[in-house]
UniProtKB/Swiss-Prot annotation:
EC number(s) reported in the record: 3.1.11.-
Broad enzyme group: hydrolase
Coiled coil: none
GO MF term list: 5'-3' exonuclease activity; 5'-flap endonuclease activity; DNA binding
Native organism taxonomy: Bacteria, Bacillati, Mycoplasmatota, Mycoplasmoidales, Metamycoplasmataceae
Annotated GO biological process: DNA replication, Okazaki fragment processing
Disulfide topology: none
Secretion signal span: none
Biological role: 5'-3' exonuclease acting preferentially on double-stranded DNA.
Name recorded for this polypeptide: 5'-3' exonuclease
Stretches assigned to the 5'-3' exonuclease domain: 171-262
Keywords of this entry: DNA-binding, Exonuclease, Hydrolase, Nuclease
Amino acid sequence: MTKSGSKSEKFLLIDGNYLVHRSYYVSFKFKNNFRSTIYLFFQTIIKIIKNLNPENIFIAFDEEGGTWRHDLCKEYKSQRSKMEDEFWNIFKAIREILDSINLNSGGFRGHEADDVIATITSKFKDENQIYIFSRDKDLLQLIDKNVYITHDNELKNLISIENFYQNFQLEPDQIVDFKAIAGDSSDNLKGIAGIGEKGAKNLLNNFKSLEKIFDSLESTNLISKAQKQKIRDGKEQALFLKKIVTLNKEVPMKLEKELFAIKININEEILEKLDKYDSRYVLKQFEKALESDDYLW
C-alpha cells in the first residue's frame, strides 16, 4: 500500500538510533527487554503516524564503522561505551524487521543518521513540511519555516522557527556556532576553554556569528580583556569544531520523492519469518493502523 498526495506533503523523518535507545531503556520496566523494545519502537511509530498522518517517512540509522567526523577528529564520541550484546541484537532485529516489511529506513556508510536527515530535509523542505522525531540537539540547526522537531509522540511540543528563540535564546543558524564555542561533552568535543554555554550565548546574541565575533574582537568593548584572550587562544579549535558539528546536507543518497512514500508489506510469510522476534502482534497493529479509515490512502 502506498500513500500519495498533493504537491505539499508531510515528511516524517525519525532518528532511528534515538528511538531504539529510548525504547530499550523504557523496556527495563518490563520482563522481556528484547520483545518490549521492539514493541515500544513500533508502537511509537504507530502513534506518531496516527497523530501526524504523513505522506512520506524515513527512519535514519548510523551504519557500522566510522564517519567523516571520526576521520577529522579521533576524539569524536570516543568516550562512548560500546553497545551491549543484548542492545546490538535488538538493534539488528529492528533493522531486519523494517527491511522485511519494506518501511523506508537506512543509513549511508561514512555519514551519521543526522547527515541523512539533513540531506532529506534540505531536498524537500521548500515545498513540503518536514517533521523530525529526535532529541538530538545537532538537528536543531535544521529548523526552518517548514521544519519542525519533536520527541513527543503526541506532537504537542513541536520546536519551530516561531518558538525557537524562546526555548534556546538563539536562532537555528546559530546552533553550530554555539557548539563550536561551548563544545559538546556528549560528543567529546571541547570548545573555547573558559567560555561555556552561557558565555557562548551572550557572545552570539551580541555578534550573531562565530566569524563576526572574531572580526570584532579587537575593536569591541562588549568582551572583557580576559575573555578576548580566551577567544584568541581558542579560535582555531572553534573553527575546526564548526566543521565537525555542521551537518552534511549533501549525502550522495537517492532522493526521488516516491522513495519516501509510506508503504509497507506485511503478509503471513513475512510474519512467520519474523516470528523469531515475537513481533507479530505489534506488526498486525501497525498494518491495522495504516489501513484504518482515518489513515487510508
